[in-house]
């Protein structure tokens, strides 16, 4: 299934799920690089009543992350459970449930590693769609979602595309994922454990192959 068909299918489901509901919160999970962000961008173009939320915007600062990473016994767990500010995201979700007023916060800056990008969320929208990894993890915010969508894809091809993209982005500064200290290596290990232990596809209300 291509991204356009996937977008249309999810859009129809959102209309169905949101019928007779004042507010709806939907989480989109899937392997890193499967196309969650692109899909959400396309959904917003199709449905103006969607409030898009990217989990990556809620990452902790790079300074805080490095302290956790340095002292961790198992660094993969940092990426799985502590990389994001779950309390901050939870507050946005809870406010969305009960308010329609603009909600202003500062989000993560991937370049500086600081929490300094101002962002305003339009809580008058009826459907909040949040995309990210580990979205259905029982130790995080899984219980807050009304509906769950899981995206499946060819992991080998996804990894191949991501590596090519990262090599192009970083050039001579590219850090191979096979290196023991590679951040992405830790993420991949955590993701594979998450899929094996918690079976996110089996928790989903809708599973799509893209």
Residue map of PLM features:
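Conserved glycine(s) of the Walker
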Residues: 35
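Extreme N-terminal, non-catalytic leader segments
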Residues: 1-25
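Small-molecule kinase domains that catalyze NTP-dependent phosphoryl transfer to phosphate-bearing small molecules
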Residues: 168-210
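Conserved nucleotide-sensing/catalytic segment adjacent to the nucleotide-binding pocket
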Residues: 51, 60, 64-112
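ATP-dependent NMP and nucleoside kinases share a basic, alpha-helical "lid"
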Residues: 114-168
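Hydrophobic positions on the alpha1 helix immediately C-terminal to the Walker A/P-loop
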Residues: 39
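P-loop (Walker A) phosphate-binding loop of NTP-binding proteins
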Residues: 31
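Post-Walker A helix-loop "phosphate-sensing" segment adjacent to the P-loop in P-loop NTPases
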Residues: 45-53
């Amino acid at each position: 299934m291509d991204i356009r068909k996937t977008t249309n299918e999810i859009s129809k489901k959102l209309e169905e799920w949101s019928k007779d509901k004042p507010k709806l919160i939907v989480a989109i999970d899937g392997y890193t690089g499967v196309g969650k962000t692109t899909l959400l961008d396309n959904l917003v173009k199709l449905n103006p009543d969607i409030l898009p939320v990217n989990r990556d915007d809620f990452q902790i600062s790079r300074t805080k992350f490095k302290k956790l990473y340095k002292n961790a016994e198992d660094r993969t767990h940092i990426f799985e459970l502590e990389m994001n500010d779950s309390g901050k995201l939870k507050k946005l979700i809870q406010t969305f449930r009960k308010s329609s007023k603009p909600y202003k916060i500062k989000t993560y800056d991937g370049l500086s590693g600081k929490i300094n990008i101002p962002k305003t969320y339009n809580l008058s929208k009826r459907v909040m769609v949040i995309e990210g990894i580990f979205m259905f993890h029982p130790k995080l915010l899984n219980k807050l979602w009304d509906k769950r969508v899981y995206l499946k894809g060819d992991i080998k091809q996804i990894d191949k595309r991501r590596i090519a993209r990262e090599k192009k982005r970083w050039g001579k500064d590219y850090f191979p994922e096979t290196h023991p200290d590679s951040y992405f290596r830790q993420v991949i290990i955590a993701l594979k454990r998450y899929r094996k232990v918690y079976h996110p596809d089996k928790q989903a209300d809708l599973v799509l192959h893209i």
